[in-house]
């Protein structure tokens, strides 16, 4: 787990004026998301979200992901404490509508994302921190897309939102 998080830290790139590319599909531009300012303390008091995947969509994509939570810059004293837990949740959203939910299995999140079109943002709730994190980048929904594999998972980077 620590190795996966370290590898993810090495892959983080800053926002540039040119559109970024989705590492799993270089032809798909990735839209940077402006994260909110970090909260005063990383330990939150946010209850486990009740995110669910709707069943009334005809189109799906799949994602295999390893998470990287960027704590080092804002919380250097806590960055070494990060722990992935079975009760953690990764969710995909288009706007404020939840379109996919997953919990970790052996350090990976296996998620089906339903929808039709739009910019997908990822949110992650940590049971350890009782806090919500948002992915630094969004991507466009594509029907039948397969983002990541067990051997090469997608590695989204997250920052704390505190909401």
Briefly describe each language-model feature range.
Residues 11-44:
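Bacterial Sec-dependent N-terminal signal peptides
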Residues 35, 48, 53, 136-163:
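Extracellular beta-sheet/turn segments enriched in Thr/Pro/Gly and aliphatic residues
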Residues 1-13:
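Sec-dependent bacterial lipoprotein signal peptides
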Residues 124-135:
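Short acidic/polar inter-strand loop motif in beta-rich domains
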Residues 38-94:
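Short, surface-exposed binding/anchoring microloops in extracellular/periplasmic proteins
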Residues 88-120, 124:
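Tryptophan-paired
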Residues 22-25, 118, 160:
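Non-transmembrane "mature" sequence context
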């Amino acid at each position: 787990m620590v190795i996966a998080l370290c590898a993810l830290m090495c892959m983080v790139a800053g926002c540039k004026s040119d559109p970024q590319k989705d590492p799993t599909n270089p032809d798909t531009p990735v839209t940077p998301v402006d994260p909110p300012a970090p909260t005063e303390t990383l330990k939150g008091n946010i209850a486990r979200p009740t995110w669910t995947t709707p069943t009334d969509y005809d189109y799906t994509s799949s994602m295999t992901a390893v998470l990287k939570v960027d704590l080092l810059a804002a919380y250097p004293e806590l960055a070494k404490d990060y722990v992935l837990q079975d009760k953690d949740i990764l969710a995909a959203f288009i706007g404020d509508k939840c379109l996919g939910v997953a919990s970790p299995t052996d350090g990976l999140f296996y998620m089906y994302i339903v929808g039709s079109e739009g910019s997908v943002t990822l949110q992650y709730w940590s049971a350890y921190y009782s806090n919500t994190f948002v992915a630094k980048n969004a991507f466009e929904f594509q029907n039948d897309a397969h983002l990541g594999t067990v051997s090469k998972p997608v590695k989204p980077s997250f920052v704390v939102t505190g909401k």
